[in-house]
């Protein structure tokens, strides 16, 4: 089972998923992480300042899905496409023209990830994007894009299923925010407790 994404996947939920597999006796699955912090679906940076953010998803995905024995992939990707653009007057490398619509993200995932996963005979599961309320570039428009994209991720027939990470970590009274004790403090990345909840939200069918 390949876990594909950005900094959220580069951190702890795949580790907690591995621990869960050991604890619950899912002994016929390996959890493989393929994650790069800062990476986006649709674009990559051409400047050395953000070189560590790596390649865009269109380039990464075909390379990183070459995993011997892989049967399924969970894709949790796209939040950086939404939160990075701030305008050239703030950061010359992050123009507003980089801001995607929800349809841009949907078409990107459909054409770049779903299509290639099918070529490799992989089952592909969507992972919803987590709350961002309070993040330093948060605004209502960004959250509207996130929520519209999430709704598609939950319902799109192109996927074999959805891992609703957003539902696992969001607040019950205010779903735009992390639940209590689930925010690492920057309002973007989850706490250790939240990463554990994300791992617990992965359906058993992916682990058998």
Task: Label every PLM stretch briefly.
Residues 32-34, 127, 165:
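Short glycine/serine/threonine-enriched helix-capping/active-site loop
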Residues 30, 121-123, 161:
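Proline-centered loop/turn at the N-terminus of a beta-strand
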Residues 61-64, 68-71, 109-116, 160-168:
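Phosphate-binding glycine-rich loops and adjacent basic patches that engage nucleotide phosphates
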Residues 15, 19, 59, 63, ...:
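Solvent-exposed, polar/charged alpha-helical surfaces in well-ordered, non-transmembrane soluble domains
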Residues 129-208:
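Catalytic His-Asp segment of secreted/periplasmic serine-dependent ester chemistry enzymes
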Residues 9, 18, 22-23, 66, ...:
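Sec-exported extracytoplasmic/periplasmic mature domains
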Residues 76-81, 112-147:
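Active-site segments of SGNH/GDSL-like serine hydrolases
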Residues 1-108, 135-138, 189:
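Conserved SGNH/GDSL esterase-like catalytic core that processes O-acyl groups on lipids
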């Amino acid at each position: 089972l390949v876990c594909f994404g950005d900094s959220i996947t580069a951190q702890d939920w795949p580790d907690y998923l591995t621990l869960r597999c050991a604890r619950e006796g899912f002994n016929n699955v390996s959890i493989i992480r393929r994650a790069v912090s800062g990476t986006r679906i649709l674009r990559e940076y051409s400047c050395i300042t953000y070189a560590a953010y790596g390649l865009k998803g269109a380039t990464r995905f075909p390379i990183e899905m070459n995993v011997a024995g892989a049967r399924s992939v969970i894709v949790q990707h796209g939040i950086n496409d939404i939160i990075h653009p701030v305008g050239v007057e703030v950061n010359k490398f992050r123009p507003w023209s980089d801001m995607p619509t929800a349809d841009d993200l949907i078409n990107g995932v459909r054409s770049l990830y779903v299509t290639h996963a099918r070529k490799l005979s992989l089952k592909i599961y969507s992972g919803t994007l987590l709350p961002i309320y309070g993040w330093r570039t948060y605004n209502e428009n960004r959250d509207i894009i996130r929520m519209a994209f999430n709704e598609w991720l939950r319902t799109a027939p192109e996927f074999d299923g959805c891992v609703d990470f957003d539902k696992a970590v969001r607040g019950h009274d205010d779903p735009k925010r992390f639940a209590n004790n689930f925010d690492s403090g920057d309002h973007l990345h989850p706490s250790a407790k939240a990463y554990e909840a994300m791992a617990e939200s992965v359906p058993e069918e992916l682990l058998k």
